[in-house]
Every structure is written in C-alpha cells, then in structure tokens.
C-alpha cells in the first residue's frame, strides 16, 4: 500500500465519522438498514405530480446540514484521525464537501463556500491533497434537472454559472503562494487566514463567519470586523472582495429573474455578469506601523482583503 484515500461529507446521513459511539461502529449492515427504513407512503404524502421531481428527491434524501446542528470541525477532526490510522502513509481526501446529498438547497449558496474554504485550510496539514466534489452540476450519477439551481453538487451550475464556492476557492487559490502562520486564527467566530505572494508585494487576508448550525435557517446580525495588519510602510492601496447576499450570489439573481427553466444563453450571461465578484477599494488608516480596516461579515459571508505594498 502506497497511500490512503477516503471520502467524507459533514452531512453524511449514515457514516457520521466523528460523531459515532463504539456501539455505532459495531452495527451490522442489517441494523443500519433497519435504522434508516422509512414509510414511503408517509414520505410522499402531500406531493402532487405537478410539484416535479426535485421536491420528491429532497424528501427521499434529506440533508443533515439543512436540519441539524453539526460540528464545523468534522473534516479536520476526521482527517487527523485518518492520518493517525494511516501509520505514516500519505492521506488523500479524493472526495469531500459539506452536503452529502444531491439536491440540498445549501449546495447553491455561500454556506457551502464558507464551509469548504475554512475546512480546506483547517485540514491542510493533515492531508497530502484533497478534492472537493465536484466541479459541475453535470455528472454521471443523475440526469439534468430543469431548474438551473437545484442543489447540485457542482461548483458551477449545469450551464456553467459559477456558484459562491467556485468564487471562494478561486480567490483562495489567487490569495498568494505562501500561507502565514496564525495559530488559532481559524477557531473563532470569525475565521482568518493570511497569504503573501512570492515577491512579497501584496498580503491577502481571508475572513469568514462560517457556521454549520441549522444550516438553512441560521441568520444572525452582521458582525463588525476590525482588521489590523503590521506593515513596514503604508500600503499603496487596500481592496476587498466579498461573497455575501449581494456579491457572488447567482441563486438570488436567478430567483429575481423568476426562476426560469432551461435558461437561454442571454440569461446565462446576465446571471453570470450580475453575480461576478471583483476587488473594490477599501478605506484604511496607517499608524504606528499598522494598517487598519473595518468591514462587516454576516453568517457564512466571506471577505478577501488585499493589502498592496
């Protein structure tokens, strides 16, 4: 054996790797099947033929991250556990994400973006490599849905419209070649990571108010964030790129359009343009060797703040 590869989802309805007791680990396949049996007649009660396939699908495969309180550190805790069990072999997470089921409404929102960015950074030291599942809503396990935003696993919709998680991982990739050590910075209500480019001409700070509790329902007031960065000289500029309700939110654009099915090329182009994210100037002050900026973060918002030297 040369390496270990595994998959994990925070909302996995069966494995719940980090939440299992010793009794759970000893369950037989038959016991697990019995536990998850459902009354199909009761499950589909109230559904009408005109409701379409998606509501039925969501009843058959409910998503834990939409209904339950889950530990946001599941991926990190499990990765450390797997690495210990691997006895020195390289560990790869070749498939992971927050939602374990296709059709989960959160898959189209910034809730997934915030989870994936923070989880990837938290588990970085435990893994040789990892791959978020998956890149596009078009994949071989299910047929296409008429709804453009139907809770597919992809970072892009079936017509190639970038979702919040696509924007977040792209910005993370572009943040810099060197990650700075900030012990404990990912563990608070506001999680933070910092990066600089190879030439040390710019510093980028990622912040997110990521929360996995009651994934679909949790709404809390925006939190004021005061960011202080020590620099040898005042930066030439400071810029911010946001992923929130108004930025990088193609689902909202589609809903405001009336949730059309089978999008036209013009509609795809419009939603893509309206939900694009770009860096904008952010006012700052510089005194006593430090640059200071302020902004706000709502639940599962993400902000990348770039200090250009």
Feature-to-residue mapping (PLM):
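Noncatalytic carbohydrate-binding groove/subsite architecture in carbohydrate-active enzymes
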Residues: 1-120, 125-126
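Flexible, active-site-proximal loop/turn residues at the rims of small-molecule/cofactor binding pockets
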Residues: 10, 136, 309
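Short aromatic-enriched loop/helix-cap "lid" or pocket-rim segments at secondary-structure transitions
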Residues: 15-19, 104-106, 142-146, 251-254
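A structural motif corresponding to the C-terminal end of an alpha-helix
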Residues: 77-91, 122-129, 168, 172-178, ...
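Aromatic/acidic polysaccharide-binding cleft in carbohydrate-active enzymes
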Residues: 95-214
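Carbohydrate-binding surface patches
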Residues: 187-234, 238-259, 299-304
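C-terminal beta-strand-rich structural cap/linker in extracellular carbohydrate-active enzymes
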Residues: 262-309
